[in-house]
Regions:
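Sec-dependent N-terminal signal peptides
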Residues: 3-13
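Bacterial Sec-dependent signal peptides at the C-terminal "C-region" and cleavage site
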Residues: 11-23
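Terminal domain-start segments
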Residues: 20-94
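Short consensus segments that form the blades of beta-propeller domains
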Residues: 80, 107-113, 192-197
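Short, surface-exposed coil-to-beta transition loops
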Residues: 85-88, 102-103, 112-117, 164-168, ...
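Short beta-strand elements that form the blades of beta-propeller/WD-repeat-like
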Residues: 100-108, 178-185
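Mid-length scaffold segments of soluble, non-membrane domains
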Residues: 101-136
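Short aromatic loop motif centered on NTY/YTY
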Residues: 130-209, 214-216, 220-230
Length: 230
């Protein structure tokens, strides 16, 4: 009985230590390095978190005179409209052998959206992400976002792939199931090529398994931002 009691105390101590080490999303946001949001100082970051329960979002004036809006905040997810042209998402991803890590997606919306994805410890130490997409980097996944339809000739497909290079990738995080959706966008496409581009686009969904993102769903992608294909 004494041994069981000691084991119970050790377990409680371990759990308390883990709970103490784990950081809230608010703490992670406040401790994020300044260069990720240069037009939000610490006071503005703190002010952004003061969202009344009665509203779905909170907006503040940033240091550039624009508006920054907190769209979503949960225990493990945060989405912020930094400006009209930029968004930032933070998602805490569980790991098997350590604390949850931070997945950060920064999306810039010019003529077409483009995302960069970074991974960090909860102390904001960057993690090598060259193998976190099925053992590959995000850029290595580009070729998997295009597919040749049966009715399209090989020559036409290769022509479109050449025109499509370089490709812009938009990444969307889902806090509900720890997934990331990759959507391809061309830097430029003519009206003549638009319909064929719709035919070769793929939207791929990846689910976090505790170590990396792995493919789970493949969908043909209709990019509304390219306009009608009629």
């Amino acid at each position: 009985m004494r041994i069981l009691f000691i084991a119970f105390l050790l377990l409680c101590s371990t759990l308390s230590h883990i709970a103490a080490d784990a950081k809230s999303m608010q703490e992670i946001w406040m401790n994020m390095p300044q260069h990720f949001t240069p037009y939000l100082n610490q006071d503005l970051r703190s002010k952004l978190l003061l969202k009344p329960d009665s509203v779905s979002h909170n907006s503040i004036n940033n240091l550039l005179g624009g508006t920054t809006t907190l769209d979503s905040l949960t225990t493990h997810y945060m989405h912020i409209q930094l400006s009209k042209a930029a968004t930032l998402s933070l998602l805490l991803l569980p790991t098997a052998d350590s604390d949850s890590i931070i997945c950060m997606v920064q999306t810039y919306k010019g003529d077409q959206p483009e995302s960069t994805v970074s991974f960090f410890t909860q102390e904001w130490q960057e993690i090598d992400n060259q193998q976190l997409w099925e053992g590959k980097s995000l850029q290595d996944m580009q070729h998997e976002l295009l597919v040749k339809p049966k009715e399209m000739s090989e020559a036409r497909f290769k022509q479109l792939v050449a025109i499509f290079n370089p490709m812009l990738i938009e990444v969307t995080l889902s806090p509900n199931d720890n997934t990331a959706t990759l959507s391809p966008h061309p830097m430029f496409v003519t009206e003549e090529d638009k319909k064929d581009f719709h035919a070769i686009f793929l939207q791929r969904k990846f689910k976090w398994d505790g170590k990396m993102f792995k493919k789970v769903i493949i969908n043909h992608f209709t990019n509304k931002s390219l306009g009608s294909t009629k």
